[in-house]
């Protein structure tokens, strides 16, 4: 008579479940990190702080990570911004960006350009709050094969003062794990144009 260990099927199912969860997590992060990982004030730091890509100190790689755009904007205007890696030897790259006013509150709305960027939707695996809809943008799965991304940002109709864009970037070695990758942060400040008409 063959004796079957009743705990064996449960153990196998547990291993399969954990393996599936690990695979989904790796795939999810390749399609864009969770929200609030730009390094901005009140964010949860970067992907390095989440324990995901923490092999090296922040901004310790040789690449140059930057945000470029206009120096000013008009209230209600839609402007274009570019997030870039230069002098990078990484095989895959990614980013996440948000914009904040002088009181460290999210400001404006982002809009994706093409298929390499996406506005983070609320209430999925990335954990974006409903009230922050439209305020975070990042790479897509196809976008992690790029080193440069263009996005749009729509200023509020009554925007004033200085807006600071915060971005975190991942320079990855493409080995399918979260080790050996460099995380960078950068900022860009632009100012709302003053209304001078009639003066």
Model features per residue range: what roles?
Residues 1, 14, 97-100:
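Detector for methionine-enriched segments
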Residues 12-21:
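Bacterial N-terminal signal peptides
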Residues 2-12:
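Bacterial N-terminal signal peptides that target proteins for export
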Residues 22-154, 158-198:
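Sequence context surrounding c-type heme c attachment/ligation sites in exported
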């Amino acid at each position: 008579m063959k004796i079957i260990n009743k705990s064996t099927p449960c153990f196998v199912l547990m291993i399969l479940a954990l393996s599936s969860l690990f695979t989904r997590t790796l795939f999810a992060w390749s399609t864009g990190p969770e929200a609030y990982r730009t390094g901005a004030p009140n964010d949860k730091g970067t992907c390095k702080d989440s324990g995901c890509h923490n092999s090296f100190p922040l901004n310790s790689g040789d690449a140059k990570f930057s945000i470029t755009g206009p120096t000013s904007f008009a209230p209600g205007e839609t402007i274009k911004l570019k997030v870039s890696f230069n002098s990078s030897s990484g095989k895959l790259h990614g980013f996440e960006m948000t914009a904040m006013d002088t009181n460290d509150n999210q400001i404006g709305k982002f809009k994706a350009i093409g298929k390499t960027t996406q506005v983070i939707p609320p209430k999925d695996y990335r954990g974006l709050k409903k009230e922050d809809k439209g305020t975070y943008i990042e790479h897509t799965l196809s976008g992690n094969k790029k080193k440069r991304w263009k996005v749009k940002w729509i200023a509020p109709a009554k925007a004033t003062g200085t807006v600071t864009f915060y971005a975190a970037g991942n320079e990855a070695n493409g080995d399918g794990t979260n080790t050996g990758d460099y995380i960078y942060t950068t900022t860009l400040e632009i100012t709302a144009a003053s209304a001078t008409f009639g003066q």
